[in-house]
Amino acid sequence: MTPKSLDLTPGPFRFFHSQLAKYIPVPKDTSVAGATAIVTGANGGLGYQCAHDLLALGLSRLIIAVRTPSKGEEAAAKLRQKFKSATVEVWRVDMLSYESVQAFAANCETLDRIDFAILNAGLIEDKFKLGPEGHEVMFQVNYLSTILLAVLLLPTLKRKAPSGSPGRLTIVNSGTALMPKFPNTPSDQVLPECDDASKFVAMNSYARTKALAHFWIVKLAERVSAKDVVVNLVDPGLVKGTDLHRSMNPFVRPIITAVKSLTGRTMEQGASTFIQAAVVLGEETHGSYLMDWIIFPYNMAVYGPNGETLRDRVWNETLKALSFVDIEKIISSVSR
């Protein structure tokens, strides 16, 4: 049996070792003919490349989910021109708005079929900024709204997957998620720190919003069977040509650009990690974190007796933060 992330021995994040990992391309015989997929944040960068490569593998219907429909339509027009037999649609979802996320998930219920969803929308901000829901914007987009959308999609993915196959849900994560440290005393809350301006440090705060999913997915996998929906996290690595760092300090951006030019993966390589996680690999990835095209350990804080406490704490705090839609009841509806 393939070990899952929780079965592996954690270690420090070794950036250059990861960037130089052997590329494992999508097998040439991979086909998604007849399938329907949802890709959020697919108007540019890795999301667009992933959408393109899925269509090249025969995808029949693609839902591009974006905050700005006009940008989505520009991307869709290029894809329609190249893949004329496929249906490419643009749907709006604003990850800064709970109402928008709920409306998008409700629209997904109208689809006849959904084979897999790839939640790729994310952002990095250089300065502390509160969004319309009252949370720091990276925390809102990268964690709270992403988890909300993931949970809302679970029942739909279970129902709409082809007969005999589980639904597939891949959440794009980051290697930086291996870096943050977390409190080790029972009284410390985890999520509120993400909204504390006095503790905001751009890159560390971004990494923290990504690391939270490591705790959450362990608990989710205890409740949702891989026979119903396979849920995993994937890190694409640092990729050339993406604009994720566009909001970073202008003094930092050139450094990131230089590192990308030296060690960055190509767009095709980065997008292949998404396709491996959502299409190629199977139920063995359920509840795991994929990095360098393989199942990888979580953030070190997930492990051990204190890790178990932290997993419970993040889970319960997340249930409370999203209690307005009773996500516990939704998860129970697809539980084993």
Show which residues each predicted segment covers.
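Rossmann-fold NAD(P)H-dependent dehydrogenase/reductase core
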Residues: 4-245, 328-335
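Short, contiguous pre-domain boundary segments
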Residues: 19-20, 296-303
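Intrinsic disorder
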Residues: 66, 84, 95, 129, ...
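Alpha-helical packing segments of well-folded alpha/beta enzyme cores
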Residues: 75, 213-216, 270-274, 314, ...
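C-terminal helical subdomain
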Residues: 101, 257-298, 308-310, 320
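A recurrent short beta-strand within the Rossmann-like NAD(P)-dependent oxidoreductase core
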Residues: 169, 231-232, 274, 287-290, ...
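Mobile gating loops/cap/lid regions near enzyme active sites that modulate substrate access
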Residues: 247-254
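C-terminal helix/juxtamembrane-tail motif
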Residues: 316-336
